[in-house]
From Swiss-Prot:
Taxonomic lineage: Bacteria, Pseudomonadati, Pseudomonadota, Betaproteobacteria, Burkholderiales
Domain of life: Bacteria
Cofactor(s) listed: Mg(2+)
CDD domains associated with the record: NDPk_I (cd04413)
Protein name, entry field: Nucleoside diphosphate kinase
Length: 141
């Protein structure tokens, strides 16, 4: 088992529903530590840069529009196999297909407004964590 860090974003739909604490409780209940966190309202440029990997995909504009529609809660999570653990907690991208008891099954409305983002691999996690928390703004505990 490997100690890993991953990025998690609680998206505008879940922030608006006031379920940040419930989602944090799930992270902590699964043994993940929140080692950095901040609430921000992404600019269009920030959202486009963060999701640049999807720039050529048909959903890119809608994704960016959604991500700038309200504040988001961004956190770096740390723990054993944090990337896979967080992805299991999130559930399938489409909340209709997400397993009961996952974050998306419980809090998401649609495949677009799907409550959370999580890094999908160690390489992307490193880039995504550095995007939001450059330098020494992460505190292992």
């Amino acid at each position: 088992m490997a100690l890993e860090r991953t990025l998690s974003i609680i998206k505008p739909d879940a922030v608006a529903k006031n379920v940040i604490g419930q989602i944090y409780a799930r992270f902590e209940g699964a043994g993940l530590k929140i080692v950095a966190a901040k609430m921000i309202h992404l600019s269009r440029a920030e959202a486009e840069q963060f999701y640049a990997v999807h720039k050529e995909r048909p959903f890119f504009k809608d994704l960016v529009d959604f991500m700038i529609s309200g504040p988001v809660m961004v956190q770096a999570l740390e723990g054993e196999n944090a990337i896979a653990k967080n992805r299991d907690l999130m559930g399938a991208t489409d909340p209709k297909k997400a397993e009961k008891g996952t974050i998306r099954a419980d809090f998401a409305d649609s495949i677009d407004a799907n409550a959370v983002h999580g890094s999908d691999a160690a390489e992307t996690a490193a880039v995504e964590v550095a995007f939001f928390f450059p330098g020494l703004n992460i505190y292992s505990r």
